[in-house]
Amino acid sequence: MNTNRYFSFSRLGLVMKRDFMENWKTNLYTFLGISLAFLLVYLLYMNDSNGSSNDFINDHAGAFASITSFLLVYFASETMKNMRTKEQRFSYLMLPATSLEKFVSRALYVTVGMFVMILLASLLAEVVRWAFMPFFDELPDKLKVCVWLDAWGKIFDDLNPFKATAKLLVNKNAFVLGGIMGGTVALWWHSLYILGGNYFGKYAFFKTTGIIILVAILLAMGISHIDFDFGPGTFEWLDEFMRNNEDWLNENFVAGVITFIFLCFTAFNWWLSYKLFTRQQVIKPKFRLL
């Protein structure tokens, strides 16, 4: 079979297994570091005896979501971490697998793999928390619960746009579309760091963040110099068009259009990342921009 033409899940599994085995020590240190971050959150909120049980779980859920969001973005920029040296690039590029299989392997590692690692690391921190609880005297009842299960359950419920609360059932469709739109924007933001990780060498996270900040500043400066003092009646045609088509031109339509646009941007970033990956060389040019 020609490995340059056909996608094979068996080869993909072998590439992922090889990547995991060769980097087991780095993965272990990463896992322990993430566990320590979650353990610090547990210990911090164990000293807080005020507030209700719901507040206690909400605080943990907020901290878990913040840590997870940062880690997923950071490790997205580390997509090509296993190809930073000439020896690593030679070893990875010479694997008997297609470029797509190698790219998908790394993509799964920094997305699904990292999320699973975060879940397990937070679970380990929960186990350690329970192990140290006997050393604390007279702990309130709100601390004697499985915080890991309740906190992650709340996060998943909040991220699920189809589980609208009772006060949002009046316009549930708009709430669902708004949630999907927000998730699409988050995927687009994540894809920017996937793209940055495939383009930059070292310090991809900081370089990508710096470019995003620079572009935001330039856009803000450009917008500030635009004269928005339009004459009367400039947008009358737009107002009339919206009133004549209000049966379909509503917030649901706008949310759907925005979702589609960001999905296109996300797909383009992933496609461009793959194209950059296929152009990886064992010996990189000496003079390379950034």
Regions found by a protein language model. Name each.
Residues M1-F90, S99-L290:
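Hydrophobic alpha-helical transmembrane segments of membrane proteins
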